């Protein structure tokens, strides 16, 4: 009886028409006979780089496209006190350069939209949001009308939260119906700047589309809001929302309260400090105290990182176990049809062959790609401020997460898959810049 072995297929990158990259899996690789390995052959480990690739375009990750985000909804906040109220409850700065109590339209930031978050008084994330100037509104003066984009499953809760704490502030809050406004995300890796010149002009005095760059990660794309047109008129292929999720996951960007856990996640651990959601020069907003203290005096030991799942090497005897060397995508983990969707949310991550504290917590994923909250000193080579290397990370260590019915620790009950975290270049750069301050 031949020993069990793993078959690794090769991929060939092709340049398709129009500059769109594709991936071809050689049929010969699927049918070519494999030489059996001796039963006693040790498992070989390859590709343990801890950094995401700079220019690779993994299979299944589209280099250009536009996707409607049904997972997001819009809330209208309009009235004389709308800007003042928002300034006091979000992490971003609505009035950069002005610290007075009564901002006017001249003091407001000029960009069409920006990323921010609502926090609890203890500094934990309630909602991650994009906030836009509502330039459709002609019934209020400039700067009195705003649109808040939020996780669709949390939109009603945020609306109630705003109403509860508005007190005597003069503004109205309303959740937009699906037909009133839609959220899209567009990207074009070959020409990222092309989207800045595509905003259409419209016959009425109010535009029916709002566009703004998504600055959470370099060249992540653009956010678009449409109000009367079914689809933005852009020369890009229309893709399902899953394509956008995979793009986020590859860049290490969490979104919504399934990934930024409501009243649990912390801004720094969720990378909000590195994605432009927090203005640390701003004062007097809900949750500021802990957020500022963490920035200047705390050590952030956990961060949300992109992760790749691959088969548990202990499931078969002998063979070659290929440890992912890049954040590449496939529709399953490569073991009995297992996918990232089968990993329970918040499942614990453990180190293979060792017991001890959890190395992280799984958040969400598609196929073999997803996000996890990872302990940096255990799962990555990142050296924390004030510490030296060798505090926990060991080159060659592997990690495992359970599919349910047991913990992620090696030896736990239930099926397991292995997991590897990567630190995106943009996050490494952001962390390095903090060390210089």
From Swiss-Prot:
Compartment(s): Mitochondrion matrix
GO cellular component assignments: mitochondrial matrix
Keywords linked to the UniProt accession: Mitochondrion, Transit peptide
Molecular functions (GO terms): transferase activity
Gene3D superfamilies from the UniProt entry: Probable tRNA modification gtpase trme, domain 1
Residues annotated as transit peptide in the record: 1-14
GO BP of this protein: iron-sulfur cluster assembly
Region (Disordered) location: 35-56
Family: Belongs to the GcvT family. CAF17/IBA57 subfamily.
NCBIfam families: ygfZ_signature
Protein's UniProt name: Iron-sulfur cluster assembly factor IBA57 homolog, mitochondrial
Organism for this UniProt entry: Chaetomium globosum (strain ATCC 6205 / CBS 148.51 / DSM 1962 / NBRC 6347 / NRRL 1970)
The gene coding this protein: CAF17
